[in-house]
């Protein structure tokens, strides 16, 4: 038989060694015995015993031989070395996608070939067979670990423990060969159920049993396999096949994250705009040969063949509504702690669900609290919260989001849904997927040392969790590149259905690009190309055919506009870039407010800045108050002597607004205040404690009336998604609960919102005047050129 390649680590050095050999076929047995013969020849005086490694669920009787070996030699045998070995079968290099999918079929797993395939491999490609040894340990070391960490009572329990340790050591040796992207926890259920720590906590839960806890661990377990990891990466590429095949990364960020992950376990918290995100993160880790993530997902996604496949690729499905199930909460908490302790990485959406508006939702803290508990309990000296920004040039799901905003029901997940979802990805090209990894947040920095004072201070811990989560979200936003899609849609939405020429689009976009460059905002390739007319043409053409732009090219030159029925879809893209213009938009509105204020206009300016921040806090992320004020001052510092101009008011403030580039608040923020105003108008004659559904239904009805009467600029603010946030705003203003002056305060709030909308009108008028003046100048220049 042709000899296999021996792993350099597969050398026995101890004088007394028990080899636990994982041998699943006569071929593997022969390979290992040949290898053992080489070891004996290398060290003639050493004692090498070999025993077949018991399977993971071996009955007690199958452990008798191992028990005898562990007990042999009494005290002298305590320092006997235990070395696990197995034959590792290297998959063929450069396998096709079809071959990877075929690896799931019975008898086709390249990592575990059947005996016939093994013999063929040794004849044709013996380099693919490798005798691999796991890390060794002495009997005394293993016995101490067993006594310290488990509830085992007899020698058969100890033998079970040794067998599990051998399997885990072989798994570690295997992923060192394959690469970190195949790293995954093994034997989680038996390890946890045997843990003294786990059993002690279980005893504190009334009625809890080991059997029931075991069933819950089966539900959480990933059932990981190498072939499933390969297939899931193929599935990820299939789901995202409508995009460019290569994801767009920042290589410096990838290198920094690789270094960080070598030191500490991490939770990868990704922004969530599409179901594709769940496939993007694992593929991104594989692309960059980074350790895999074990992603939490709702049990609603565990359907058909997808459930088992995703489990084996590292997906952890969790139940919903677990507040009334203390045993499940405990098992989930301990499961998270175990995975973190073993230095595996977790992942989920920081927003908890897809953002159907395009802007980032507030972070959810549920799972984060379990990770914090694991850290505070000393499971790791630090845990990194690694943000992941995922953005797209385009998404096919925006049509669904627009329908949902109008009141449609969510489509339930299932096999037919998945088929249609994957099918839709091939309908056209959606551009690029951009993946960014901003600097990670240290849990230790916010929670202090493990077992520290914050451990038992629930209020302090929750506050720290909120600060951590918001910091991660803030870093995600700052790392998210601007896309041409978002910038173009923002511009066309302000035109309110009026078509623009290529020249108008190109010229108007330059102010925004100048601002983003000045602020050193990350830019996508598509956004950078907007500097040229060709880049603008490529961007609007990609969005044409109502995706969501309409092109008219039957005249002298093509023009582009957004039809009323496509405004909600376009708003999704516009909303994805608002965060970059949020502070400068607030500056414009505060200037318009101060322009018409009496008395101290500087005070009026700053008061309105902070008031607008307070009203928008449920829709957008802001820096803390001090940093926010500093950012606003920095925005104004671009205008010389701005404070005296604001204090003077009138024409002096107008001069600032006319000089400001870009003038963009009307494009970015108006729709949110229109939605707030619709809800506030509904509240004028609504009862106290009105239910959210009733408020939304009334707002949809009144909003449609507003659209028909042209009391709002478009149909965009008539959205269940925006009304949900508006409900939070009015609740924060204490306009829902009963009070003696409720009617007066509701009317006052509506009046305040209408004043803000008048400020939008004022800024918008200046922006339009400037646009018209520029167009007239450009036309005059063209006429002069023609006359020459």
UniProtKB/Swiss-Prot annotation:
Question: Which keywords does UniProt give here?
Answer: Acyltransferase, Cell membrane, Lipid biosynthesis, Lipid metabolism, Membrane, Phospholipid biosynthesis, Phospholipid metabolism, Transferase
Q: Which GO terms describe its biological process?
A: CDP-diacylglycerol biosynthetic process
Q: Which reaction does it catalyse?
A: sn-glycerol 3-phosphate + an acyl-CoA = a 1-acyl-sn-glycero-3-phosphate + CoA
Q: What is its EC number?
A: 2.3.1.15
Q: Name one GO molecular function term.
A: glycerol-3-phosphate O-acyltransferase activity
Which pathway is this protein engaged in? Phospholipid metabolism; CDP-diacylglycerol biosynthesis; CDP-diacylglycerol from sn-glycerol 3-phosphate: step 1/3
Q: What is the top-level taxon of the source organism?
A: Bacteria
* EC top class, as a word: transferase
The record comments on the domains as follows: The HXXXXD motif is essential for acyltransferase activity and may constitute the binding site for the phosphate moiety of the glycerol-3-phosphate.
Protein name stated in the entry: Glycerol-3-phosphate acyltransferase
- Which species is listed as the source? Mycobacterium marinum (strain ATCC BAA-535 / M)
Q: What is the lineage of its organism?
A: Bacteria, Bacillati, Actinomycetota, Actinomycetes, Mycobacteriales
């Amino acid at each position: 038989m042709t000899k296999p390649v021996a792993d350099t680590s597969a050398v026995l050095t101890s004088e007394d060694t028990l080899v636990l050999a994982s041998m699943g076929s006569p071929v593997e047995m022969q390979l290992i015995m040949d290898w053992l013969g080489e070891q004996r020849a290398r060290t003639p005086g050493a004692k090498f015993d070999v025993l077949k490694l018991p399977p993971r669920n071996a009955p007690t009787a199958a452990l008798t031989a191992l028990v005898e070996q562990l007990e042999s030699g009494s005290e002298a045998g305590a320092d006997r070395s235990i070395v696990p070995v197995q034959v590792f079968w290297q998959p063929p290099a450069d396998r096709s996608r079809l071959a990877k999918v075929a690896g799931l079929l019975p008898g086709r797993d390249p990592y575990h070939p059947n005996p016939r395939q093994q013999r063929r491999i040794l004849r044709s490609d013996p380099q693919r067979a490798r005798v691999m040894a796991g890390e060794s340990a002495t009997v005394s070391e293993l016995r101490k670990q067993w006594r310290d960490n488990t509830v085992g009572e007899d020698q058969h329990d100890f033998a079970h423990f040794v067998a599990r340790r051998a399997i885990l050591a072989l798994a570690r040796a295997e992923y060192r060969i394959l690469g970190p992207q195949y790293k995954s926890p093994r034997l989680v259920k038996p390890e946890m159920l045997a843990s003294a720590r786990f059993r002690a906590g279980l005893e504190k839960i009334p009625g809890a049993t080991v059997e029931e806890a075991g069933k819950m661990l089966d539900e959480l377990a990933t059932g990981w396999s190498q072939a499933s990891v390969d297939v899931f990466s193929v599935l990820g590429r299939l789901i995202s096949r409508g995009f460019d095949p290569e994801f767009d990364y920042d290589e410096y960020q990838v290198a920094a994250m690789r270094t960080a992950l070598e030191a500490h376990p991490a939770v990868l918290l990704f922004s969530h705009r599409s179901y594709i995100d769940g496939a993007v993160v694992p593929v991104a880790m594989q692309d960059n040969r980074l350790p895999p993530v074990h992603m939490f997902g709702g049990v609603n996604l565990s359907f058909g063949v997808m459930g088992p496949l995703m489990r084996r690729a590292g997906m952890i499905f969790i139940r919903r509504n677990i507040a009334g199930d203390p045993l499940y909460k405990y098992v989930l908490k301990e499961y998270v702690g175990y995975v973190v302790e073993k230095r595996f990485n977790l992942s989920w959406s920081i927003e908890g669900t897809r953002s159907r508006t395009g802007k980032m939702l507030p972070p959810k803290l549920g799972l984060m609290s379990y990770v914090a508990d694991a850290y505070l309990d000393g499971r790791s000296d630090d845990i990194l919260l690694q943000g992941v920004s995922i953005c797209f040039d385009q998404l096919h799901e925006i049509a669904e989001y627009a329908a949902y905003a109008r009141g449609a029901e969510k489509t339930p997940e299932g096999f037919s849904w998945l088929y249609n979802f994957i099918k839709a990805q091939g309908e056209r090209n959606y551009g690029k997927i951009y993946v960014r990894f901003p600097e990670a947040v240290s849990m230790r920095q916010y929670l202090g040392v493990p077992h520290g004072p914050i451990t038992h201070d629930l209020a302090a811990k929750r506050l720290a969790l909120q600060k951590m989560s918001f910091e991660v979200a803030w870093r995600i936003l700052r790392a998210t590149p601007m896309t041409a899609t978002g910038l173009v849609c923002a511009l066309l939405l302000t035109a309110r259905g009026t078509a623009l020429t290529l020249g108008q689009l190109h010229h108007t976009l330059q102010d925004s690009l100048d601002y983003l460059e000045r602020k050193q905002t990350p830019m996508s390739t598509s956004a950078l190309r907007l500097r040229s007319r060709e880049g603008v043409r490529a961007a609007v053409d990609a969005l044409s055919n109502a995706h969501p732009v309409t092109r008219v090219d039957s005249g002298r030159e093509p023009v582009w506009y957004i039809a009323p029925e496509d405004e909600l879809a376009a708003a999704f893209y516009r909303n994805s870039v608002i965060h970059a213009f949020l502070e400068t938009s607030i500056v414009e509105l505060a200037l318009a407010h101060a322009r018409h204020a009496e008395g101290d206009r500087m005070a009026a300016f700053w008061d309105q800045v902070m008031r607008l921040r307070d009203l928008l806090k449920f829709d957008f992320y802001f820096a803390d108050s001090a940093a926010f004020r500093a950012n606003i001052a920095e925005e104004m510092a671009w205008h010389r002597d701005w404070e005296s101009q604001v204090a003077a008011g009138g024409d002096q403030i107008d001069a600032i607004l006319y000089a400001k580039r870009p003038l963009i608040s009307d494009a970015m923020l108006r729709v949110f205040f229109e939605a707030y105003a619709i809800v506030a108008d509904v509240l004028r004659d609504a009862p106290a404690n009105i239910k959210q559904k009733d408020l939304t239904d009334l707002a949809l009805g009144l909003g449609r009336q507003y659209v028909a009467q042209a009391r709002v600029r478009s149909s965009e603010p008539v959205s269940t998604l925006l009304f949900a946030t508006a409900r939070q705003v009015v609740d924060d203003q204490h306009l829902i609960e009963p009070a003696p002056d409720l009617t007066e305060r509701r009317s006052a709030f509506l009046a305040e919102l209408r004043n803000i909308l008048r400020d939008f009108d004022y800024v918008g008028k200046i922006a339009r005047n400037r646009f018209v003046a520029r167009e007239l100048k450009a036309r005059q220049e063209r006429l002069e050129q023609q006359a020459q």
